[in-house]
């Protein structure tokens, strides 16, 4: 994500933490079904200034290979990397 305002950035980070795991400073892995994804998008729109900020959502299809340790272990293959 790219959020111009510190207050909005903290709010968005806290929102994303409630859906998944922070893997880098502005990258989160979230295992989401369609309902949760739509909920996350709606809540993010209320936090973001869509004229200044950006949140990118990348659906991941297929297997994910992890080298090293991984705190996530969901069985559902449908997850989104933010």
Q: Which residue ranges define each predicted feature?
A:
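Residue-level detector of functional hotspots within protein domains
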Residues: 11-16, 41-43, 65-66
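Extended, hydrophobic alpha-helical segments
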Residues: 1-27, 31-36
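Short, intrinsically disordered low-complexity segments
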Residues: 24-54, 59
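C-terminal structural segments of small proteins and small subunits
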Residues: 46-82
């Amino acid at each position: 994500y790219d959020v111009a305002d510190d207050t909005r950035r903290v709010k968005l980070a806290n929102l994303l933490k409630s859906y998944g795991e922070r893997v880098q400073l502005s990258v989160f892995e979230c295992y989401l079904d369609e309902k949760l994804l739509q909920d996350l998008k709606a809540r993010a729109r209320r936090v973001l200034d869509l004229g200044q900020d950006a949140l990118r959502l990348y659906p991941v299809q297929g297997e994910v290979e992890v080298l090293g340790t991984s705190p996530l272990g969901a069985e559902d293959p449908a997850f989104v990397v933010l």
